[in-house]
């Protein structure tokens, strides 16, 4: 049995000001997006022919960051705590309180990329296929931030690597944040980076992202402690699982359509 180290959530103390680990994880995700994106533009010439430049990459990050933050926050309020935020709508703006939803952030990014595509004269799936392999690094960094903060812990377990989170209780639990780091971060990155290493049918890389993330998230949710204010929903599935199922279904449909073109 392992014990969570209970890290200080503030990574860097600067007098009365502190830089939190979770903020650093966002920064790592954004910087990795730029570095990997520039590598692809320089070493995979078909992306340049599709209209990708360093300027477009920088602007895509700006649009995407807005989509992640706004969509993630609104998604959390809508999917997880809608009753609370209906009576406290102004607190949606308090980003330092409450949480963020990946599925809301994903929808926010889709809207942002639609606007970006229209403004730059690019195709939506041309953008999403380029962006999709860059995203898992940020997802993995975010899950590592969850682990450092000791949040989103797993269900009770007697496995050798089960971990006690002392600030929660004395029960050994799945370190589900690390499972998500390995699957949604490392495994999904390797899969998408490999698949997109040569030209593919338009939409197929995006489809693989939907299938991969949705499947990994659905599986890990079986080890993750359900949100106390929601519990399990219909068929004993969590909110995260119900939100991930449409991603898998849409991904399978999109992959079939893409490969038939």
UniProtKB/Swiss-Prot annotation:
Localization in the cell: Cell inner membrane
Membrane topology: Multi-pass membrane protein
Annotated EC: 2.5.1.145
Binding residue positions for a 1,2-diacyl-sn-glycero-3-phospho-(1'-sn-glycerol): 143
Biological process terms in GO annotation: lipoprotein biosynthetic process
Taxonomic superkingdom: Bacteria
GO annotations of cellular component type: plasma membrane
Cited HAMAP family: Lgt
General function of this protein: Catalyzes the transfer of the diacylglyceryl group from phosphatidylglycerol to the sulfhydryl group of the N-terminal cysteine of a prolipoprotein, the first step in the formation of mature lipoproteins.
Protein name as catalogued: Phosphatidylglycerol--prolipoprotein diacylglyceryl transferase
Species name: Methylobacillus flagellatus (strain ATCC 51484 / DSM 6875 / VKM B-1610 / KT)
Taxonomy of the source species: Bacteria, Pseudomonadati, Pseudomonadota, Betaproteobacteria, Nitrosomonadales
């Amino acid at each position: 049995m392992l014990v969570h180290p209970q890290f200080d959530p503030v990574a860097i103390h600067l007098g009365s000001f502190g830089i939190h680990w979770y903020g650093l994880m966002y920064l790592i995700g954004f910087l990795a997006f730029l570095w990997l994106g520039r590598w692809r533009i320089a070493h995979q010439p078909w992306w340049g022919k599709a209209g990708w430049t360093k300027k477009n990459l920088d602007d895509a990050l700006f649009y995407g960051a807005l989509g992640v933050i706004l969509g993630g926050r609104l998604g959390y309020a809508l999917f997880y705590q809608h009753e609370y935020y209906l009576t406290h709508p102004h607190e949606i703006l308090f980003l330092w309180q409450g949480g963020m939803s990946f599925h809301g952030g994903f929808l926010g990014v889709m809207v942002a990329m639609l606007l970006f595509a229209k403004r730059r004269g690019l195709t939506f799936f041309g953008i999403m296929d380029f962006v999709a392999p860059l995203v898992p690094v940020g997802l993995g960094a975010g899950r590592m931030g969850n682990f450092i903060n000791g949040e989103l812990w797993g269900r009770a377990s007697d496995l050798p690597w089960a971990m006690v989170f002392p600030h929660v209780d004395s029960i050994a639990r799945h370190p589900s944040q690390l499972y998500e780091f390995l699957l949604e971060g490392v495994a999904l990155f390797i899969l998408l980076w490999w698949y997109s290493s040569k030209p593919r049918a338009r939409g197929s890389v995006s489809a693989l992202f939907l299938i991969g993330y949705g499947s990994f998230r659905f599986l890990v949710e079986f080890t993750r402690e359900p949100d106390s204010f929601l519990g399990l929903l219909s068929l004993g599935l969590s909110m995260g699982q119900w939100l991930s199922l449409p991603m898998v279904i849409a991904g399978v449909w999109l992959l079939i359509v893409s490969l038939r073109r």
